[in-house]
C-alpha cells in the first residue's frame, strides 16, 4: 500500500513540476512578445496601439501569465532612464479592467507615483482615473504628493470617482 501512495505522490509531483514549467514558458513567451511590441510601438493618447490589441488577446488566453509578464517588465525597466518601456506597461494596464489587473496593476500604479520622472507619476494617478473604479478612492486618499499639481490631480480623480466611478 505504501508503494502505491509513493507512486501517486511521485506522479503528482511530476504533474505539478510539468505544469510549473509550462506556465513559466508561457509567461516568458508573453514577456518577450510584450516587451518587443512595447519597444517597437508608439503610445499616443487617444489612439489604440498595436501592443494594446496584443495584450487584450493575450489576456483572454491567460490573465495571470500576462500580469506576471507585465510585472517582470515593470521591475526590469523601472529604474531605466528611458521611460518608453515603463510608459508602455502603464498604457497597457490602463486598457485592462481594474478588477482584472488586481492586485499587481494597483501595486505598479502605486509604485510609479514615487518615481523620479514627473510624466510617470502623472500616469500612475491617471491609471486610477482610467480604471474608473470606486475601489481606487480609498487608495488615492491615502497618498500625499510633494508637488501641488499632482496633489490637485489626485483630488480631482477622487472627486471624479466618487461622482462617476463604477
Where are these regions (language model features)?
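Amphipathic alpha-helical scaffolding segments comprising HEAT/armadillo-like alpha-solenoid repeats
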Residues: 31-37, 64-77, 99-114, 133-144, ...
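Long alpha-helical HEAT/HEAT-like repeat alpha-solenoid scaffolds in very large eukaryotic proteins
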Residues: 143-166
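Residue-level detector of extended alpha-helical repeat arrays and alpha-solenoid scaffolds
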Residues: 82-86, 121, 151-154
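Amphipathic alpha-helical repeat scaffolds
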Residues: 55-56, 75, 87-90, 94, ...
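HEAT-repeat alpha-solenoid elements in large eukaryotic scaffold proteins
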Residues: 41-52, 78-91
Amino acid at each position: 500500500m505504501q508503494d502505491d501512495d509513493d507512486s501517486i505522490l511521485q506522479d503528482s509531483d511530476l504533474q505539478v513540476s510539468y505544469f510549473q514549467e509550462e506556465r513559466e514558458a508561457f509567461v516568458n513567451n508573453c514577456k518577450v512578445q510584450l516587451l518587443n511590441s512595447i519597444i517597437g510601438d508608439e503610445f499616443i493618447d487617444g489612439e489604440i496601439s498595436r501592443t494594446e490589441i496584443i495584450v487584450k488577446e493575450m489576456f483572454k488566453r491567460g490573465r495571470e501569465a500576462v500580469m506576471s509578464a507585465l510585472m517582470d517588465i515593470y521591475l526590469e525597466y523601472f529604474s531605466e532612464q528611458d521611460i518608453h518601456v515603463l510608459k508602455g506597461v502603464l498604457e497597457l494596464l490602463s486598457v485592462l479592467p481594474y478588477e482584472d489587473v488586481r492586485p499587481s496593476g494597483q501595486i505598479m500604479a502605486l509604485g510609479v507615483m514615487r518615481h523620479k520622472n514627473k510624466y510617470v507619476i502623472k500616469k500612475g494617478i491617471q491609471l486610477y482615473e482610467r480604471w474608473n473604479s470606486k475601489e481606487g478612492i480609498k487608495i488615492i486618499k491615502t497618498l500625499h504628493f510633494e508637488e501641488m499639481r499632482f496633489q490637485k490631480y489626485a483630488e480631482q480623480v477622487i472627486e471624479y470617482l466618487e461622482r462617476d466611478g463604477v
